[in-house]
Design a protein with these regions (language model features):
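Conserved SAM-binding loop of SAM-dependent methyltransferases across substrates and taxa
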Residues: 196-207
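Accessory substrate-recognition/RNA-binding modules or partner subunits associated with SAM-dependent
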Residues: 21, 26-130
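Conserved class I S-adenosyl-L-methionine
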Residues: 186-195
Length: 416
């Protein structure tokens, strides 16, 4: 039995300054916020959705969209029909379900359904219904504030495994990095592996200028979309994004050779993936295409080249833990390998938050991509992980934070 082919993603969404203004106004008016969505779904469905189980939320949304539509101002906020627009947005963009086109059109009076289709936010289907083409989620933080983040549909929304070109939304890893990053004002910041742009959005609250790099043109397109959509809260001029943000395509630090930054952040594609099949696709959203933990080693070793004096780098990483001479894998030293990547003269702090054995690591990342939905592919990939780790004598894999600082010439503690 051969693996089931994974359907490709639709084109990345796109906005003009004018359509970004229209969409932002519509989402704010719904209001498409975390609190409003939780109020619509209720605590049970909200918690279930947080656990990646959508059926309770689908039941609630279906109840709001049942029956004849009503899209006039007479429907108050407490009326069931007054929530149809919000329910349509939740159904399309948080659940990935088909919703009545008329309801979503009414929810977007400025952009309109035609504008949403043209922007790549929804695709039209049969029977007067539309389905979300992206995940568009409300996001709130103390800084910069209330926003909306677009990314590719999740495996739950797709109801199938993720394609290689997938662009992740805001997940636990990105929230971990955002929460750990020091927020002192800096002149120039760099986001390596920008993805949907969440770290860049945070950096703009305290950096004069941000450069964001990614190997994926699709990721850069999502980042541009999110910058345009949230320009008001970010303090950006939609017609002059380049005044404060530069989006650069390329591998790791290649697009910024010769430049210096006060702060570098990165949630790189650090996930270790067997490279036993040269024809296997590279999952650019999480796997840098190198063997083992080589992509993290390359990044850590090269970061001094882009750090200004007193500058700091903060990143998340995986590192392999060799079996060594001990029979107990849990006692093998975890930091010898990542410390060997740090250039002389750099100050380094390493924090290991988690450690997994080879089987546990394989299960975590195969489930993350929902490959269990394709049992033959899952079993083959699981065996590939075990063979790959065994071939290199890997006892475990560590996950954690790496903080680097280039000392200032005057011995001060740095800019960030």
């Amino acid at each position: 039995m051969s693996p089931v082919p994974t359907p490709p993603s639709p084109p990345a969404p796109r906005l003009t300054p004018a359509t970004a203004v229209a969409l932002a106004a519509d989402l704010a008016a719904l209001p498409f916020t975390t609190a409003a969505v939780e109020g619509l779904l209720g605590p049970v469905a909200t918690l279930a959705l947080d656990r990646a189980h959508a059926e309770a939320a689908r039941r609630v949304v279906a109840g709001h969209l049942a029956g004849p539509g009503r899209h006039d101002d007479a429907a108050g906020p407490g009326d069931r029909h007054g929530t149809r627009g919000l329910a349509a947005a939740v159904g399309a963009w948080l659940l990935g379900d088909p919703v009545p086109a008329a309801d979503l059109d009414a929810a977007l009076p400025s952009l309109g359904l035609a504008g949403a289709v043209a922007a790549g936010l929804v695709v039209e289907g049969p029977d007067g219904r539309v389905r979300g083409a992206v995940d568009l989620s409300p996001y709130e933080a103390d800084e910069p504030g209330r926003m909306w983040i677009a990314s590719d549909l999740t495996a739950q929304q797709r109801r199938g495994p993720l394609p290689p070109e997938h662009v992740l939304g805001v997940g636990r890893a990105s929230l971990t990095l955002a929460g750990a990053t020091q927020r002192r004002p800096v002149a120039r910041a760099l986001d390596v592996g920008v993805g949907c742009g969440i770290q860049t959005l945070h950096l703009l609250a305290h950096a004069d200028h941000v450069t964001a790099t990614d190997l994926s043109e699709r990721a850069l397109a999502f980042t541009r979309f999110n910058l345009l959509l949230n320009a008001d809260v970010l303090g950006l001029d939609r017609d002059r994004l380049e005044d404060r943000v530069r989006l650069a395509a390329g591998d790791l630090l290649a697009p910024v050779t010769g430049e210096r930054f006060d702060l570098v952040v990165s949630n790189p594609p650090f996930v270790i993936t067997p490279r036993t099949d040269p024809d296997a696709p590279v999952l650019t959203y999480r796997d840098g295409g190198r063997e083992g933990d080589r992509i993290v080693a390359e990044l850590i070793a090269a970061l001094p080249d882009v750090l200004a004096e007193g500058g700091t780098a903060q990143l998340l990483a995986n590192w392999e833990i060799p079996a060594g001479d001990t029979a107990d894998a849990d006692t093998a030293p975890w930091d010898a390998r990542p410390r060997s990547w740090v250039a002389p003269g750099m100050q380094a702090w390493l924090l290991q938050r988690d450690r997994q054995d080879p089987a546990g690591y394989a299960e975590t990342w195969l489930q993350d991509s929902s490959l269990e939905l394709d049992p033959p592919a899952y079993e083959a990939a699981y065996r590939g992980y075990l063979d790959d780790f065994a071939a290199r004598g890997v006892a475990g894999v560590g996950f954690g934070h790496v903080w680097l600082r280039r000392p200032a010439a005057d011995g001060s503690q740095g800019r960030a």
